[in-house]
Amino acid sequence: MKKLYLIFIMTILGSFLQAQPVTLKSVDAEKEFRLKLYYGNGGKGAFVQYEGKKEIIPLRVKSYRLDTISGGPGQPAKHYFVWDEMVNGKFNGTYKMLQMQNYIADATYIRATDFRHFNLELVEEEGDPDGDDQYLLHGAKISFNHFYNNKLLIEYPDGKKMNAELPFPDSPDAAQQSIIEDYSFDGYDDLAFTIPDAGMGVYSMFTIYLYNPKSKRFGTV
């Protein structure tokens, strides 16, 4: 079974975008607002947190499209995301965004109550990225770091927490990558972490956390 998981990971690694959280700000609102958008491959595990707010708002993938052709040979792939904003389980708005590597374009938010359209733009962060990332998957908030440590924290909706350590890259230039997919083929997305072998680009180490819908917990394979 582990061999099957590894083959599955290797198949999709070539086409997915290693997303990291981005900060967006409004450009045409009467009062500027800012938000941080967290998301994984294909837009999965996404949520937003508005500046000055403690609450996080889940985002449900409405559509995702990968375009590897229109840019031509040697050009970065285009990732088109559309998310539904869900507040207390109810639809509250729509986010749209185009990403090409580190370039963000056509980011918008449409508020459901009055269909107000807000244009958003990327806020350029100063200094090097801290590597911190988070997902919201099956109601659990998952926190980890791509570059600087191997700590994994999963916080469940009932307040329980799980702490773990992930394999850490041998090379200082390597990064911890993550993939959200249904590895157990049971209709529920799971979570995998992969690191390259000594930074050579061959993904030889991986850790998979399968989601159990009965216990509502993640567990390693």
Predicted segments, located by residue:
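Extended interaction-bearing regions that mediate binding to partners or small molecules
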Residues: 43-45
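Beta-propeller-forming repeat regions
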Residues: 21, 26, 30-41, 54-181, ...
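Sec/Tat signal peptide C-region and signal peptidase I cleavage site
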Residues: 15-19
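Single-residue recognition of alpha-helix boundary sites
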Residues: 13-14, 197
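N-terminal ectodomain recognition module in secreted, GPI-anchored, and membrane glycoproteins
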Residues: 48-51
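Sec-dependent N-terminal signal peptides
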Residues: 3-13
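Low-complexity, repetitive regions of proteins mediating host interaction that are extracellular
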Residues: 2-3, 159
